[in-house]
A protein has these predicted regions:
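Positively charged, low-complexity terminal tracts
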Residues: 1-101
Length: 101
């Protein structure tokens, strides 16, 4: 399983929580499983500002999709996407930890 580490400052953490919250409430309204999304929200919320978040491949895909969804929503509303773009760029630059054997 590949993991990715991303450093989140206060603004990126807030935007990621907003995006994941929208996905969580959408899943809940549709009667879907919210377990994975809920756990990721709690992990991001417990992270100190400037801390590094380690995500599995599934969590990475979920966070990326959530940020893309929030960006699309803001574009449709005619709002600014600067903060979402920054959080998405930081997430996309997340690296896999180097394992030395």
């Amino acid at each position: 399983m590949t993991e990715r580490k991303v450093k989140l400052d206060r603004a990126n953490k807030s935007i990621l929580l907003r995006a994941l919250g929208d996905v969580y409430y959408g899943q809940r309204a549709n009667g879907g499983s919210t377990e994975v999304t809920g756990r990721l929200i709690l992990r991001v919320n417990d992270l100190p500002a400037g801390g590094k978040l380690t995500m599995s491949a599934a969590e990475y895909r979920l966070a990326k999709a959530a940020l893309n969804q929030l960006r699309t929503q803001r574009l449709a509303e005619g709002g600014y996407t600067d903060a979402v773009d920054d959080a998405l760029a930081r997430l996309l630059r997340a690296h896999t930890p180097l394992l030395l054997w």
